[in-house]
Amino acid sequence: MADNPVYALGAKYQLPFEAVKTEVNLWHYRMEDVFNQTYAKVKFSTDISAVNFYLTPSYLTQKATGDETGGPLDTYQYGFHLGAKFAGADITYLYAKTGDDTVLTPWGDEKVVIQQVYQSARADEEVNALKLAYDFEKLGLNGLEAYAYYGQYDVPENAGSDFSEMNYSISYKFSGALSGLGLKARYATIDFDQGENFNDVRFYINYKFTLGH
């Protein structure tokens, strides 16, 4: 499978609507003797008073081809993000439904729900998630951002264990003499209905710089 070439064709188009900004994304991938994938996503957004509302539905299909070296595959995933931004806050509800087979993503992620540890990918899985993010710039704390992100992952009883994941993240981007430096801390708790629960802690240090002029 690793030696199979991948062919990709994509397009993005901004529709000429003023009241509701609309961006259409369409991609098709072909991996010989593995699978074909088609992915479509539409981004809608509009401002009502001081609130920005947005809706991002998406649909993905995957079907094995040729020698099926990645295994038999015939599945889909659809879902959406529905949210609102106001005064530095961004609240989003996310929903995803996956078809009969687990989604295969060897080169990237087009899944609807992507959390710190898990993502919407299992066969016959339904995911409901809620994310609350806040940019503290409105409070005079430039560069400070945080979010809490909860997801509930459910599958049929004979397909595996239901579980939930809770994420917490805080990040800070420095300015002035330390411009380009960023710190980030993330913490996740995963709670399985059947199985061992665990926590995941991550720390990041980033530094962005340019070479030359």
Feature locations, PLM:
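Transmembrane beta-barrel domains of Gram-negative outer membranes and organellar outer membranes
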Residues: R186, I190-D191
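Outer-membrane beta-barrel "beta-signal"
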Residues: A8-L9, L130, Y168, Y172, ...
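Detector for outer-membrane/organellar transmembrane beta-barrel domains
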Residues: Q14, K41-Q152
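A C-terminal functional module that forms or caps the active site or interfaces directly
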Residues: E137-G182
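Internal metal/ion-chelating core segments
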Residues: M1-F44
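Outer-membrane beta-barrel translocator domains and adjoining extracellular loop/strand segments
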Residues: M1, N36-K41, A64-D74, V103-G108, ...
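Short loop/turn motifs that connect adjacent beta-strands in outer-membrane beta-barrel proteins
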Residues: L15-T22, D47-F53, E137-L144, S175-L183, ...
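Residues that define the transmembrane beta-barrel architecture of outer-membrane proteins
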Residues: D3-Y7, V34-T38, V51, D74-Y78, ...
